[in-house]
Structure formats: structure tokens, C-alpha cells
Design a protein with these regions (language model features):
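Internal alpha/beta domain cores that form substrate/cofactor-binding pockets in large enzymes
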Residues: 2-4, 25-29, 56-78, 83, ...
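Donor/substrate-binding cores of folate-linked one-carbon enzymes
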Residues: 22-25, 82-201, 208
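A short, local hydrophobic-aromatic micro-motif
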Residues: 27, 146-149, 246, 279
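N-terminal beta-loop-helix "entrance" segment that forms/cooperates
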Residues: 35-54
Length: 307
């Protein structure tokens, strides 16, 4: 089966490698342009999928947007049987979806119709779900609304971070993708329409959403901090200076929301109900450090308030 692969971040790499490893004919890879890095923006970092494709000698396409007659012609010339999309980062137009002979499938890290949208991994943790998984979906014009081809449910490990769950589901997604494509190739797969009435959504993570609201209960705050680790990072302010928090667990404690309860041996901060113990922090413009090092460096004291 001849495949054209659309993907960008680390999440997509296991699916790409599974296709190559299982002998699928990956004719081309479409990924986002290299991103400028550093203060001068003069250094460019290639997407992880680009590096993986180059290592296999597979042609790479990096349009600013996957639209236009010239781009559609390039994809058509690859003569794909199927298109595979895994965290590519752009919505694909019907003209593109129609090019592969058997359409396009998407590797989506949730059990659709739950958590349609851009950030299903993080929202699964933020919402306190106990189970998530991966769906292989036939793509159509709507937002993650196409028929379900294959699903693998997985229990969400306790205290997992967004980054850890993403890596875990990326491997599950690669397995699900290979299984689904094998069934498609055999003509043995049956699609199932989604129940749109049961759909929930996982919108893009905004800076404001990542700001910690200390009036919430400790369990919800710990989920927020874990779910947004490593990116974008849940943040708060101490004396007007931004700091991101990581490695949070709900704990006992009482005080005004955002109040530092103790700095002895650990950083414990009062929530609307209970308290949150924090292991690591990241001051603005710096790397992650232990909470203990930050406490010593900033002179953080019990009674101060985070906001």
C-alpha cells in the first residue's frame, strides 16, 4: 500500500516509523516548515518527522499551508493509495482529502467522539479521565468527526504528565494505525459513524488557560500542572514575576488561595480546598530547577502569595 504521511511533532514519529517498519511504501512526507529558534531567530529547527523521513531517504514537503493547485499536484503525482495524518497541525481541505485512492485516515489520541480538537491528551488529564486511548478515523471535512475505523482504549496512569501520556499514546497510535491499514488493505475493515450527540471537545491550549487559578481545589490544580507539563506549562506569579510549576500532587493544607504554606523540605501552596505540593519550577526565561533551589535563590518564605 502506497502512503503519503502528514505529521510534525514527536507524537507522529512512532506512526511514521511503524509504517516504514511494516513495509508500507511511504512515498512522501508532508510536515510543517522548520521553526526559527533563539533570540535572533536565525537558527532553524526541523520538525521531528522531517528528521525521521530524511533518515529513511523519503521525500519531504514543507508547505506553509497545504493548499493550492501546485501542492495538490505534487501529492497527486505520488499516487498514494491512502493518506495518514498524525498531529500535522493544519486542517486539510476536501480537495486534498480526495487525492488518495482510499482517502485519508487520522491518528487521534482520544476515544472519539470524546475530546475532538487540538489538545486531547492534555484535556484528558485536566478533566480527570481515568481512560483514554487512540482512534483511527476516516477523515472528512468536519473537526475529528469522521467514521471510526479502529480504537484502542488505554487506562491513564495515575500522576502522569501530558508529555508522558502523549509519548505513551503515540506508541499505541502506531500499533492501531498499522492494524487499521492492514484491514483496509484486506478490504476487511468496517467503519462506524460517530455519535455526534456524545461529542466533547479539547480546544487549543491558551496562555490564559495555563494560568493557575488558586481558588480551585487541590486535585484540579495538580491535574492542570501535570496536564500542561512540559508544554505550555502551568504558570503563576510571585511578586509580579512569572514562574511555571511542575511535578504537582494534591496534599493536605489550609490557607488563603495561593499562599505559600511551607518552604521546609518542599514547596506547599494553599488551594481553594487543600494544598498543592510542587517539585520543580521554571522562572521566566530560564530552565527548570528544583523547587528547593528556587526557594533558596528567590528567598521564598511561608506567607507569601502566588497569584
Amino acid at each position: 500500500m502506497r502512503v503519503v504521511f502528514f505529521g510534525t511533532p514527536e507524537f507522529a514519529v512512532p506512526s511514521f516509523r511503524a509504517l516504514v517498519g511494516e513495509g508500507f511504501d511511504v512515498a512522501g512526507v508532508v510536515t510543517q516548515p522548520d521553526k526559527p529558534q533563539g533570540r535572533s531567530r536565525s537558527r532553524f529547527e526541523p520538525p521531528p518527522v522531517k528528521l525521521a523521513a530524511q533518515a529513511e531517504g523519503i521525500p519531504v514537503f514543507q508547505p506553509n499551508r497545504p493548499t493550492g493547485a501546485a501542492f495538490y499536484r505534487q501529492i497527486g503525482e505520488l499516487a498514494p493509495d491512502v493518506g495518514v495524518v498524525a498531529a500535522y497541525g493544519h486542517i486539510l481541505k476536501p480537495e486534498l482529502l480526495a487525492i488518495p485512492r482510499r482517502g485519508m485516515v487520522n491518528v487521534h489520541p482520544s476515544l472519539l467522539p470524546a475530546l475532538r480538537g487540538a489538545a486531547p491528551v492534555e484535556w484528558a488529564i485536566l478533566n480527570g479521565l481515568e481512560t483514554s486511548g487512540v482512534t483511527i478515523m476516516q477523515m472528512e471535512e468536519g473537526l475529528d468527526s469522521g467514521p471510526i475505523l479502529h480504537q484502542i482504549p488505554e487506562r491513564i496512569p495515575p500522576d502522569v504528565t501530558g508529555g508522558e501520556l502523549s509519548s505513551y499514546l503515540a506508541e499505541i497510535g502506531a500499533q492501531a494505525l498499522v492494524e487499521a491499514l492492514a484491514l483496509i488493505e484486506q478490504g476487511a475493515i468496517a467503519s462506524k459513524p460517530q455519535d455526534h450527540a456524545r461529542a466533547t471537545y479539547a480546544p487549543k491550549l491558551t496562555r490564559e488557560l495555563a494560568r493557575i487559578d488558586w481558588t480551585k481545589d487541590a486535585a484540579a490544580l495538580a491535574r492542570t500542572i501535570r496536564g500542561l507539563d512540559p508544554k505550555p506549562g502551568a504558570w503563576t506569579e510571585l511578586q509580579g514575576r512569572e514562574v511555571k510549576l511542575f511535578g504537582a500532587t494534591a496534599s493536605d493544607g489550609q490557607g488563603a488561595p495561593g499562599e505559600v504554606l511551607t518552604t521546609e523540605g518542599r514547596l506547599l501552596i494553599a488551594a481553594g480546598s487543600g494544598a498543592v505540593a510542587v517539585e520543580e519550577v521554571q522562572p521566566a526565561g530560564k530552565g527548570r530547577i528544583s523547587a528547593a533551589d528556587w526557594i533558596r535563590g528567590r528567598g521564598v518564605k511561608a506567607g507569601q502569595r502566588l497569584s
